[in-house]
Amino acid sequence: MSVFKSFAHEMLREIYEQPAALRRTLALYLDGNRLRQDMADQLAGWANPAGEVLIAASGSSRHSGLAAEILLEDLCGLAVDVEYSSEYSCRGGSDSRRPAVIVISQSGETSDTLAALREVSQRGEKTLAITNADLSTMALEAGVSMPLAAGVEKAIPATKSFTCQLAVLFLLTLYEAKRLGRMGAASATHKPKP
């Protein structure tokens, strides 16, 4: 595709940019078909030993979190809850569980999600941030950061960042499934519907 191709609107251009954004994002994490060792080292121990995960996000990022909920539960056997970031800050303090927390934000600066991250960090919970801005506040304050390389999005609806969030969450799931010794079990029990 020519870099000079014109599009009727920004969103259409960003849709066509998704394959390149995915390649750039996957290159951050993979060495051939394996998770890069530096990333594996960074992810080691991010999860809670009780196998509980909370995902806090808003908007399209929350939708990628809902997809991750299914992946992490089905393939890793983890107990996952997905919360609107704004609601977590209102009720999170009453939660006696201590789940590992994943925050997802395209900008890494979403105020409700940042407030949730700060709240759980103060309680000493393990945190992981997935953002499209590797120097964002969330990326810098979380215990582990998984940046995206989606590039700039000018259209309001998420396109490239949403697709890259899904890819990174899938890689995280595969890493956890392997770490937990569930890769064989996951593939044996997860059969496609006819």
Residue ranges and their predicted role:
Residues 44-193:
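Glycine-rich phosphate-binding loops that contact phosphosugars or nucleotide phosphates
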